Amino acid sequence: MLRSCFHHTRCLSLLLILCWMTDALAADFPKDFAAFQAELSPAISKKLATTPKHYRQIEPSLFHLCLDHADQLSMLSDDQRLNAIVKLAEFIDRKRELTGAAIVIGEDRTMIGLLDPARGLEPKEITTIATGYGAKPTVFKQDTATESIREVADQFLAAVGKAAAEGNPTSVVVLGHGSPEEIQSYSIPFGRLADTLINGAGTKAGKPVDLAHIVLICDDCYSADFLINLGTTIEARCRERSLGLGSLPIMIAGTNRDRVGHADFGEKFVPHFWKDVIELFYVRRPRPDAVTLRDFFEKVDNMMYGYGRAPIVQGTQVTGYRLVDPSLCQDPVFFVPLSDADLAELRTILGLPADAPLPRFLDIG
């Protein structure tokens, strides 16, 4: 009896030590982006066959992906963890390569816009660039003399639902005020937008909800948080309703997680993200035949990197950037849908069980 008690006590002590060691390892994983940059990025970038500019563009995405799985990564040895993170970076790069040619603004593509009713841009800021590429625009903005906020919100959602149902290539552009919970300018919660997309795409009997033909762009405060909530809710409601989910939409956020958006203020407020889209793909010549997702995650992202940062110049070369005002950094986010094969590959990299739940969308920088 005494031997049994001693054995039980010893096992319990070992278990407590193992738990303590696991907690200590998890606590060592960088929990903020600056620490990730300082502690892990030098070794990661050294192992990747890439340029400093390219690593800079995927670095925030890699950090957030690692942060989502920090406990799992923290249980690995230093070498194992570094190898796993490098594989995650390579996975992000493969998804960038595979999705980069997706057209966002182009010929015969429908464009649906929603503009802030008060000091937001005029419809021409979307219609002009759309028609310049042969796209077909419909823009909603409240006429305060004749329309209510709710009426315009209903009209916008009806157009989005129709686009989801018809399956024609469509880009939806929302410019205004936002929060993690809603498109504030028109009081549209992420749950209502999720239901609109599901109800539209779910009208095809016996077929899964497929939103691969839709690109959703939000240029407002907390847009990445809003789109994460939207994507997560679409997944959850499809499960609740026993609907298959073929694909989520591509989702583009003008601001990263927990970030406000910035704008140039005058008679109208001009969001920095969409301002740079107009500058790069409408004002500058020659124009491309179409504007692709790669144009967004390479060119727009690169242009916006200068907000809140100052270039470090040696001779005629920009060798890096110095952080000046973190509050001005928006660092746009580009979410792409993941297939079952993608999810299986991620689980393998992370050492997760084959049935471990993972989001069906990925931030690719």
What are the functions of these language-model segments?
Residues 2-12:
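Bacterial N-terminal signal peptides that target proteins for export
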Residues 24-27, 101-103, 110-112, 362-365:
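Non-Sec secretion/translocation targeting segments of pathogen effectors
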Residues 27-33:
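Cleaved targeting-peptide boundary
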Residues 37-40, 47-220:
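A domain-level signal for caspase-like cysteine endopeptidase catalytic cores
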Residues 214-350:
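Active-site-proximal C-terminal subdomain of hydrolase catalytic domains
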Residues 334, 350, 357-363:
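Glycine-rich, flexible loop motifs
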